[in-house]
Amino acid sequence: MRGMPLNSMKLFRITDVMRRKVRHIHFVGIGGIGMSGIAEVLLNLGYTVSGSDLRTSDTTEHLSSLGATVFQGHKASNLTDVDVVVTSTAVRKDNPEVLEAHRRSVPVIPRAEMLAELLKMKVSIAVSGSHGKTTTTSMIATVMASGGLDPTMVIGGKLGSIGSNARMGHGEFIVAEADESDGSFLKLSPSLAVITNIDREHLDFYRGIEDIKDAFLQFANIVPFYGSAVLCLDDPHIKTILSDIKRKTITYGMEPAADYRAQELRFNGAVTEYELYYRTECLGSVTLSVPGMFNVYNSLATVAVARELDMTFPDIQQGLKSYVGVGRRLEVKGKIAGVTVVDDYGHHPTEISATLAAARQVWKNRMIVVFQPHRYTRTQALFREFLGAFTEADLLIVTDIYPASEDPIEGVTAEALCDGIRSLTRREVRYIPNFSDITDYLMTVVQPGDTVITQGAGSVNSVGVSLLSRLKEVEDSRAA
């Protein structure tokens, strides 16, 4: 960071107290994308790691291969001689492992508290925001790695270049995603804090937008006096808190007043180009290998961070060009019989609109979207916003709400959402609750040139896997 004697800070600063007191760390819900990344870094640091999840997955198998003990299912007996138990927001308070930990007086801490300990290791960059955290974190990590900084990274998605959502680097930096969903990101104390945007999200925890804005304001002010907050000046809610931030601020966006700006934007399929300005100085051209206006914003945040770390602009250019995306963010899963299958994690109306606009930039023919709403509380709170989020879809299929440990709310259903969307569009909207029935239906309607997007944070991506498998069977039978 500019002005900081980084060469003198090349020490692992994870506290000596933690190393003396804690050897065995247990994760309840270890297969979750946020939990597994922390677990992987701790394994690389030499800690004994165990954990449990309701089902095994590629993620749990990967952790097992690194030395973790992973249990399928949650049982009190899964807790052996553990020193601390880490939980995610999806874990209920009556979870048997949590109850057993309390019975034994073993500390039970949220994921963010353990992440905070990891951030003490090195000079830390934490990326927050209602949308775009994972992509921006992975883009920053890619650029830093490309420039030879060899960062430690903890990301909320699988980065294709490393095949994982975490990596233990040998450099002096750590870059991590900061999840604001339950307010626990305020336990972090990064040297650089990024806020991509502020929106009405996680309304099961926050009382409203003012409450959300206050949390992000606290996050910006949590950085040390020598640190900085990197913020998107185009975001209207960020503008309202800017004057209350007491730390150095670096802004980006299209606004003329932003420190870093993108001008002369050019979109060509999956490739985006623009001229980058720092205040009045044109630094040069930027080429992105990923589509969408949201990725322009993500890249501007990345540039701001990289320049604070004294990276050269040619290194930044090369790193941005080499970035090809992160798992479950407009991820192409395959193309068979002329049908392209894409998966995207976006589950908030703002994210969905941006994702489908970016998809339209790349795929010009018929777009079929299979959407699985995520959480009853979100569907209820943002019902009206969801109604207008699918304007780019030529055919929309909505399946049942993914509960994510929530109990149903009376009247909040996928059928009601379908009815609302139908009232605003002439395009076809179908409610199909069963995944296998969705695949069967798709097999009757897909044509060469179609793009099928599975949209949502739950399990809807399995529909894409099934569709590709069925298409492959048909293709093979025709070739026989």
UniProtKB/Swiss-Prot annotation:
Keyword Cell cycle: yes
Enzyme Commission number(s) from the entry: 6.3.2.8
Associated pathway: Cell wall biogenesis; peptidoglycan biosynthesis
InterPro entries: Mur-like_cat_sf, Mur_ligase_C, Mur_ligase_C_dom_sf, Mur_ligase_cen, Mur_ligase_N, MurCDEF_pg_biosynth, UDP-N-AcMur_Ala_ligase_MurC
Recorded catalytic activity of this chain's protein: UDP-N-acetyl-alpha-D-muramate + L-alanine + ATP = UDP-N-acetyl-alpha-D-muramoyl-L-alanine + ADP + phosphate + H(+)
GO biological process: cell division; cell wall organization; peptidoglycan biosynthetic process; regulation of cell shape
Protein location: Cytoplasm
Pfam family, one: Mur_ligase
Record-level GO cellular component terms: cytoplasm
Keywords: ATP-binding, Cell cycle, Cell division, Cell shape, Cell wall biogenesis/degradation, Cytoplasm, Ligase, Nucleotide-binding, Peptidoglycan synthesis
Recorded GO MF terms: ATP binding; UDP-N-acetylmuramate-L-alanine ligase activity
Binding site for ATP: G129, S130, H131, G132, K133, T134, T135
Family note: Belongs to the MurCDEF family.
Annotated function: Cell wall formation.
Protein name as it appears in the record: UDP-N-acetylmuramate--L-alanine ligase
Organism: Syntrophus aciditrophicus (strain SB)
